[in-house]
């Protein structure tokens, strides 16, 4: 049976609706960076997703090509994920999606080395007639985070984020979102096949322990 990240790492891909704390180990990803409204038809985000899947499936099917990847085993392509921030916005303003800056990613199995990745980018570009040069091999070390399963539309995410923030305050933690540690979403549902109110999205935020001295001084 093919290895499935969602089943093997349930603590990362199948959290409960109730917020919880998780330490996320470093992982390698196919990544494409960009900016703009993710809903724009044929926009930068949708093009990035096409590149990600082209490279991801080239690697997945490499055992049926002349390429031999050391340590390869059959696996299910992991779900699409995204790291998000907004320029010039305090918090999140869902009414201004054009200001979103994002890193769209798909996780890589550990056996994929840099040269294997470069081969997949070249091969996908040639076979799919798609410019995949924007794809990069990216290692992300998220560390300590709070996460929860959000069920519903993307625009209703603030409800789940509010629950996460309340959980942090009640347990002595605070958000540690910065240019290097970003709001993270993992998309477990196909929006083309799932009703908006049934979409399942993992929401994850980087955190740190609160400073009691700082809190007491305010």
Identify the residue ranges that each predicted region occupies.
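A solvent-exposed interaction/effector surface
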Residues: 1-218
């Amino acid at each position: 049976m093919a290895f499935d990240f969602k089943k093997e790492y349930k603590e990362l891909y199948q959290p409960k609706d109730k917020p919880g704390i998780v330490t996320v180990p470093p992982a390698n990803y196919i990544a494409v960076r960009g900016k703009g409204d993710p809903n724009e038809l044929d926009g930068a985000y949708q093009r990035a997703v096409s590149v990600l899947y082209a490279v991801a499936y080239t690697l997945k099917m490499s055992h049926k090509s002349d390429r031999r990847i050391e340590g390869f085993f059959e696996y299910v392509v992991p779900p699409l994920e995204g790291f998000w921030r907004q320029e010039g916005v305090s918090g999140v303003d869902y009414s201004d999606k054009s200001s979103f800056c994002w890193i769209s990613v798909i996780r890589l199995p550990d056996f994929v080395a840099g040269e294997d990745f470069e081969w997949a980018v070249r091969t996908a570009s040639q076979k799919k007639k798609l410019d995949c040069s924007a794809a990069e091999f990216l290692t992300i070390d998220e560390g300590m985070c709070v996460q929860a399963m959000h069920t519903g539309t993307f625009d209703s995410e603030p409800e789940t984020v509010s629950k996460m923030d309340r959980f942090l305050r009640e347990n002595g933690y605070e958000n540690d979102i910065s240019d290097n540690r970003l709001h993270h979403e993992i998309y477990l549902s196909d929006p083309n096949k799932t009703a908006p109110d049934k979409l399942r999205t993992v929401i994850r935020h980087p955190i740190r322990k609160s400073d009691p001295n700082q809190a007491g001084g305010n």
